[in-house]
Amino acid sequence: MLNPMSTETYTPTALNFPSLNFDLGETADMLRRTVAGFAQSRIAPMAAEVDRKNAFPNELWPEMGKLGLLGMTVAPEFGGSGMGYIEHIIAMEEVSRASASIGLSYGAFSNLCVNQINLNGTEAQKKK
């Protein structure tokens, strides 16, 4: 199993326990690999410094947006990815695996903010 303090590269197979294989499908597996690669290459190297400075690295937002991680549960007609909560949790797991604090910020933005507008906003708010 991967030691979180280790410098070795994370691959989804590092946590491949047969009893935990939920067979979520190829899309979920591809999403996990993509987000894991991004999180380990971009987020993990800055995680300790982010915690020391107590600041979110704003340059990550556009990068996460390009990956489709912002607005995952929002319908495509409103600019989202149109995915479900399982996919959102997979993204949360991988971002949080690289940095718990960045994962928390991402979760607050993507679920507490964007998702609430998606669920409860007016048509105009959703389009904005």
Segments and roles (model prediction):
Residues 1-27:
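Intrinsic disorder at enzyme termini
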